[in-house]
């Protein structure tokens, strides 16, 4: 079989066409970083050695449009300190968030630190979209296994793509308006269904007012006419009318009698 020559671009070994280097965090720590520290052969020669913090991210060897992987050493910022010097010619790398454990809870194989590149001098730098993931071995594991203070780390550098925030906001606003309309229509339907299906209950145990008691008494058929206010009023009015009629009738009778007497006198 013919040996395939490795493809080089700006000093970086490249995979053949159709292949893509996309390892997981655990694979980077176990299969590459640990082997690099112990001197074991690597699965593939695709990760070069370079000092990431000595050059700006856009000047690093490799394709800026894709993810770039490097072996690098950590340089202490102070002689007796543990902080790394992450200043470049145009800016600096700033850590963001907490370090992430790589591996299972019982067996942690490494740590992952996320950094963002800022242009200018701290603390007044301007944030960019360049992101750096720094992988390192656990300190206790490194000291016990290798005996030496090896400062090797594995770095993944990439440019975060910008998203159109205005269009995204507009889409979110449209979705919110549509959701509000749907909820309003659902509420209206629920209210209509409640009105059509909900029975009407009367509370017979509540206290009645005086007016309501009078109305109920008038409308009650079991009450006698003497006790009913409406009937009593009607009977009183009828009695008044009857007395008036009797009075008028008696007056008429008297006039008729007087008329007859006068008539009889004339005949005599």
Swiss-Prot record:
Biased composition (Basic and acidic residues): 180-190
Subcellular location: Nucleus
Classification via Gene3D superfamilies: NAC domain
Disruption phenotype: No visible phenotype under normal growth conditions.
Renumbered residue ranges of the record's region Disordered: 166-190
Positions of the DNA-binding region: 109-166
InterPro entries to which the protein is assigned, alphabetical: NAC-dom, NAC_dom_sf
Keyword Nucleus: yes
GO cellular-component term (any): nucleus
GO molecular function annotation: DNA-binding transcription factor activity; transcription cis-regulatory region binding
Primary location recorded for the protein, binned into one broad class: nucleus
Domain NAC: 15-160
Biological function: Transcription activator of the mannan synthase CSLA9. Recognizes and binds to DNA-specific sequence of CSLA9 promoter.
Entry remark concerning the domains of this protein: The NAC domain includes a DNA binding domain and a dimerization domain.
Protein's name in the database: NAC domain-containing protein 41
Gene (name only): NAC041
């Amino acid at each position: 079989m013919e040996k395939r020559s490795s493809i080089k671009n700006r000093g970086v070994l490249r995979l053949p066409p159709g292949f893509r280097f996309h390892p997981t965090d655990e694979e980077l720590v176990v299969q590459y970083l640990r082997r690099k520290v112990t001197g074991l052969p690597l699965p593939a020669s695709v990760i070069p050695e370079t000092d990431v913090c000595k050059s700006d991210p856009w000047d690093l060897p490799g394709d800026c449009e894709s993810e770039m992987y490097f072996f690098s050493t950590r340089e202490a910022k102070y002689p007796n300190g543990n902080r790394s010097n992450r200043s470049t010619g145009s800016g600096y790398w700033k850590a963001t968030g907490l370090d992430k454990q790589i591996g299972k809870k019982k067996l942690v194989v490494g740590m992952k630190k996320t950094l963002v590149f800022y242009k200018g001098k701290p603390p007044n730098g301007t944030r960019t979209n360049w992101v750096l993931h720094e992988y390192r071995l656990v300190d206790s594991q490194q000291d016990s296994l290798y005996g030496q203070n090896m400062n090797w780390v594995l770095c993944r550098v990439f440019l975060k793509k910008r998203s159109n925030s205005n269009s995204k906001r507009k889409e979110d606003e449209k979705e919110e308006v549509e959701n509000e309309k749907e909820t309003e229509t659902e509420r209206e339907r629920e209210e209509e269904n409640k009105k059509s299906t909900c029975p009407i209950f009367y509370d017979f145990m509540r206290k009645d007012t005086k007016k309501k008691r009078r109305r109920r008494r008038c409308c009650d058929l079991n009450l006698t006419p003497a006790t009913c206010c409406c009937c009593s009023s009607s009977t009183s009015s009828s009695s008044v009318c009857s007395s008036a009629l009797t009075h008028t009738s008696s007056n008429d009778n008297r006039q008729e009698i007087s008329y007859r007497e006068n008539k009889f006198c004339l005949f005599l």
